[in-house]
């Protein structure tokens, strides 16, 4: 095979298979190279805090249709997700940690959630203690915002019921308007608890094994190109 655009021949494949000693050496060197990169320029630390979110769908949406329950859960999950990234939530984290909101939104924080269950708040930083502080502050700020939103939702629901009994009450109307302005749009049946926010373990964002495998794969690919396109048969081990 003489050019990069030509198809490999059977002889080319045989040449690759015959170079097994070469592959072992290259894989070893690549793994060592990946490990060296890991220790010289290690990845950031990653810390996870957890908040348990329960939507109580049976109470909030008492229907028998699984499809409607699914859509309800999806809609409410999106609302709660937005609270996690809201300006007020991130500003509280920024005030506690010293980072700007822009920095927090630019890769410092990550959120994963299975809808009903544990929501995982991840933070990354070169320093393990800083990453732990970020994750804990974010989970705490989120919990505080949601608790406030639940209180507002409960008060708004009660005010609307009272207004239905006395629709001419101007004070109730003003109170409802004020509550609606503060409302997060979440259901009052929502329940949350801060499950993991203290003494959080820190791990590297990428493991040593991933670096070793990446280094070995990279040198193996380079070695294959060298054998196929640049080395003659007599030079192959």
Predicted regions mapped to residue ranges:
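Juxtamembrane loop-helix boundary motifs flanking transmembrane segments in multi-pass membrane proteins
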Residues: 2-13, 65-72, 201
